[in-house]
């Protein structure tokens, strides 16, 4: 990213080397020297050309032709080019690959230039600074972020974050502990990250740009932000005490302004975020709940894809933001729910019809502020402002909803802006200014006059053709125009003897001659000059129009925010009505009480197959803090846990929820430990990932947290896993005291309520039918009677010989267990009979939970049993399931041989 120019000695050396090249290549090399780390799109006529290493890289990334033409300094010039008119599609591909591109345009006039036409870089396209509609995803925001770490005089290290959505002008700051950086990056998901040397960044799939440390100077950052906002103090914005974040903001704003080649007029405010504002969601929770992305990386089915019936792209982006930022303070969520209720009562059809006609005001406004709005941006903006009264009319009465009242107020039409657009912009303007027809008639008298001259050409040519036919007697004489030869009179060879003496030959064809006359030549000069002058005048007027619209940026941003908010509320109202959701009740008591709750996404998937979803209750309170959930795989344990978390999250967002009734108390964080996956890139095994996530929960969960623990301890040996699961559940009850859903196949844990009355057993039941099994998916009190592992394995397609061998061995194991006499040595959780160890780390004697007996098995048989016990069909991909089948078949063969 060429933000720094070469020093004087370096530049002198570069100039000396450049002097041995052609003038055009000298110009290219000078510009390229200022942007060494970016691809340079060098405009030459109707193409952007790339040279040398840039050409090779672009040819490889874009699959375009690499050629070599001519030579400069005795070296063939490697080059690759793309058409100017299709540059956006190539830019989109490069940006997606994390590349930055400097756009170098011709700013001089080729007709008057001596030597190479003057060129300069007008903007730099990077992954985090996109504003063009063709380069941006419609329904997701693109953020540029700067990260800066600072150590205070007391030795306390703070990490400052500043991030900017250049396509909307939204700027945010926050400071956090270094350990929280990964969680914040996962929440914000920047497209590009700016950082200085010395900072440790967690793994994140985004472009990274390193800047010198001095770019992050706190004092310079403070001055830069004050200058950007036009204020003398940042205290009213809540920036007092922020040091590292202000340094990051300075680097961010300077970088963004440099890429755009101008000031950021639409960045007119800053919001300081505090960790205490939002319900904490770590990366594992966002992934496991599939808020906006499935576990396999898809866009659907997710909570966002289910809820996104928004009518505008602005609304979809706002909905995505709401889902990733549930609020701790219930005031705003309750205001949203009140507005949704009003919209349901009034009906949303008319409002949704009105919203569908609106353009993306948010992004058009940003392009307008950056002076790169296109003609159809302005016509779309005009039509949207015209339609605002229709939107307001669809809300008959806000019925006391402060949010709807505020939205209606913010939708006030910026009349001066609308009047200017109506007067200045043609009803259906051309796509680009250079094609003409953008400025409306009547806006400028000079332009109208030039257009009249140009547009009256047709009548003049008809009149001239009629007169010349009469004068010459040539009945098939034609007067026409083309871009190469201009105006001409065409006469066929058979009529050549009738051509008058004042005709001058302009072009010879196979069967005709083309001529020019003094009268036609004079008209040509006048008409072509008028057309060129009209286009030049129109470009001048268009640039002036953009400048005249700049004072209205704030009003347009206000309108965009109101439209996005109203669109989300309308979509949530439609979803609540269509899907039969209810308004949750928010209370001060520490409680999660859900009656007939459903998983929103799974219910939608089942409905598509005409299958009813089984609703379930979930009660968590001070007397019932942890639910031990047992039952078979595929019985619905994970679905029950996830639906509880999603209902709580939706309540904190301000949406209605998929339940007959829901009472939700204060929630500060939602944690999930669900599923099994290793982290090969990070060098962590499945069990290590599991324990790392569990450690994070145990360190940070509070009594106001909701914790989901699924199959903890399964990644290691049976006794290790059981011991860990027991200790973790006990710690959550005695120390964290969080609302906890704890799913397990360790039936020994079901005795935990004997020690902790705040724990309760529930199970998801199933019924055996012959050799098969029917899952009831209903949550019932008490522990499950068995796991139905063999039946699930049979459903998964495990070969029958394996199932028969496993069933035979299971019967033997159960008989051995029944015949065995328990001894103290086999009591896994009993305290050793020594007076020094009669208390555990929690200050209380451990509960005596009987452990399973361990019969003696042949190694081959033990391997088969362990493989079956550790099999979790809920988490298997089709490929993994197939591999598991082959592995089980091989183990079964070995077990049968051993028997």
From Swiss-Prot:
Biased composition regions of type Low complexity, renumbered to the chain: 843-852
Gene: mutS
Function summary: This protein is involved in the repair of mismatches in DNA. It is possible that it carries out the mismatch recognition step. This protein has a weak ATPase activity.
GO CC aspect terms: cytosol
Taxonomic placement: Bacteria, Pseudomonadati, Pseudomonadota, Betaproteobacteria, Burkholderiales
NCBIfam families attached to this UniProt entry: mutS1, PRK05399.1
Species: Cupriavidus necator (strain ATCC 17699 / DSM 428 / KCTC 22496 / NCIMB 10442 / H16 / Stanier 337) (Ralstonia eutropha)
GO MF assignments: ATP binding; ATP-dependent DNA damage sensor activity; damaged DNA binding; mismatched DNA binding
Classification via Pfam families: MutS_I, MutS_II, MutS_III, MutS_IV, MutS_V
Domain of life: Bacteria
Tagged with keyword Transmembrane: no
Residue pairs linked by disulfide bridges in the UniProt entry: none
Protein name per UniProt: DNA mismatch repair protein MutS
């Amino acid at each position: 990213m060429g933000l720094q120019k070469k020093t004087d000695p370096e530049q002198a050396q570069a100039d000396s080397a450049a002097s041995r090249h052609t003038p055009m290549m000298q110009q290219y090399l000078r510009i390229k020297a200022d942007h060494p780390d970016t691809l340079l799109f060098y405009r030459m006529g109707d193409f952007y050309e790339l040279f040398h290493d840039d050409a090779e890289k672009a040819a490889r990334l874009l699959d375009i032709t690499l050629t070599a033409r001519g030579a400069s300094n005795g070296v063939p010039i490697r080059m690759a080019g793309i058409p100017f008119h299709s540059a956006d599609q190539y830019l989109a591909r490069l940006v997606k690959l994390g590349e930055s591109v400097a756009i170098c345009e011709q700013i001089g006039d080729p007709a008057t230039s001596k030597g190479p036409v003057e060129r300069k870089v007008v903007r730099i396209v990077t992954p985090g600074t996109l504003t063009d509609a063709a380069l941006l995803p419609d329904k997701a925001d693109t953020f540029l972020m700067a990260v800066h770490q600072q150590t205070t005089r007391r030795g306390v290290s703070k990490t400052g974050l500043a991030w900017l959505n250049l396509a909307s002008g939204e700027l945010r700051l926050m400071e956090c502990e270094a350990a929280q950086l990964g969680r914040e990056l996962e929440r914000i998901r920047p497209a590009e990250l700016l950082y200085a040397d010395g900072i440790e960044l967690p793994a994140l799939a985004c472009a990274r740009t390193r800047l010198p440390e001095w770019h992050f100077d706190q004092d310079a950052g403070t001055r830069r932000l004050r200058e950007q906002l036009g204020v003398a103090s940042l205290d009213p914005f809540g920036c007092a005490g922020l040091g590292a974040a202000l340094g990051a903001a300075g680097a961010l704003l300077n970088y963004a302004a440099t890429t755009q080649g101008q000031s950021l007029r639409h960045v007119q405010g800053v919001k300081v975020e505090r960790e205490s504002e939002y319900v904490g969601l770590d990366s594992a929770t966002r992934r496991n709940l599939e808020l906006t992305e499935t576990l396999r990386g898809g866009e659907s089915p997710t909570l966002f894809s289910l809820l996104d019936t928004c009518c505008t792209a602005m609304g979809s982006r706002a909905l995505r933001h709401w889902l990733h930022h549930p609020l701790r303070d219930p005031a705003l969520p309750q205001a949203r729910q009140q507005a949704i209720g009003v919209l349901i009562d009034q009906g949303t059809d008319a409002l949704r019809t009105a919203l569908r006609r609106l353009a993306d005001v948010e992004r058009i406004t940003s392009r307008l502020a950056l002076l790169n709005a296109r003609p159809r941006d302005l016509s779309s903006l005009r039509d949207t402002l015209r339609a605002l009264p229709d939107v307001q009319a669809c809300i008959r009465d806000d019925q006391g909803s402060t949010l709807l009242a505020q939205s209606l107020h913010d939708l006030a039409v910026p009349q001066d802006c609308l009047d200017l657009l109506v007067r200045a912009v043609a009803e259906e303007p051309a796509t680009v200014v250079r094609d003409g027809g953008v400025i409306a008639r009547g806006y400028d008298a000079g332009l109208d006059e030039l257009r009249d001259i140009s547009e009256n050409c047709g009548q003049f040519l008809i009149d001239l053709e009629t007169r010349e036919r009469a004068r010459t007697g040539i009945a098939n004489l034609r007067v026409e125009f083309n871009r190469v030869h201009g105006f001409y009179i065409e006469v066929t060879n058979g009529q050549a003897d009738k051509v008058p003496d004042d005709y001058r030959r302009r072009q010879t064809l196979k069967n005709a001659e083309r001529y020019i006359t003094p009268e036609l030549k004079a008209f040509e000069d006048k008409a072509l000059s008028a057309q060129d002058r009209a286009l030049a005048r129109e470009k001048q007027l268009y640039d002036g129009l953009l400048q005249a619209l700049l004072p209205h940026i704030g009003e347009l941003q206000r309108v965009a925010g109101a439209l996005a908010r109203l669109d989300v509320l309308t979509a949530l109202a439609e979803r609540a009505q269509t899907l039969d959701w209810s308004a949750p009740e928010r209370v001060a008591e520490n409680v999660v009480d859900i009656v007939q709750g459903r998983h929103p996404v799974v219910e939608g998937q089942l409905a598509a197959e005409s299958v009813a979803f089984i609703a379930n209750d979930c009660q968590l309170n001070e007397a019932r803090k942890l639910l031990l959930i047992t039952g078979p795989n595929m019985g619905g344990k994970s679905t029950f846990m996830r639906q509880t978390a999603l209902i709580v999250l939706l309540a904190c967002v301000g949406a209605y929820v998929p339940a007959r009734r829901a009472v939700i108390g204060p929630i500060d964080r939602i944690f999930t430990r669900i599923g099994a996956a290793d982290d090969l890139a990070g060098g962590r095994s499945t069990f290590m990932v599991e324990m790392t996530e569990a450690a994070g929960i145990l360190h940070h969960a509070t009594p106001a947290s909701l914790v989901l623990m699924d199959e903890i301890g399964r990644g290691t040996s049976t006794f290790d896993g059981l011991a860990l699961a027991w200790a973790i559940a006990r710690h959550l009850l005695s120390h964290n005291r969080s609302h906890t859903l704890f799913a397990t196949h360790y039936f020994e844990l079901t005795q935990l309520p004997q020690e902790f009355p705040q724990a309760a057993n529930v199970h998801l039941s199933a019924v055996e039918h012959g050799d098969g099994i029917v899952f009831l998916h209903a949550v019932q009190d008490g522990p499950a009677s068995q796991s139905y592992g063999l039946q699930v394995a049979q459903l998964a397609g495990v070969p029958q010989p394996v199932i028969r061998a496993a069933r035979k061995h299971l019967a033997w194991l159960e008989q051995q267990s029944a015949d065995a006499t328990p001894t103290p040595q086999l009591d896994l959780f009993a305290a050793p009979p020594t007076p020094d160890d009669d208390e555990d780390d929690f200050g209380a004697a451990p509960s005596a939970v009987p452990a399973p007996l361990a019969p003696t098995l042949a190694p081959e048989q033990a391997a088969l049993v362990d493989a079956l016990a550790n099999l979790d069909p809920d988490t298997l991909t089709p490929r993994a399931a197939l591999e598991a089948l082959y592995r089980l078949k091989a183990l079964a063969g070995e077990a049968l041989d051993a028997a």
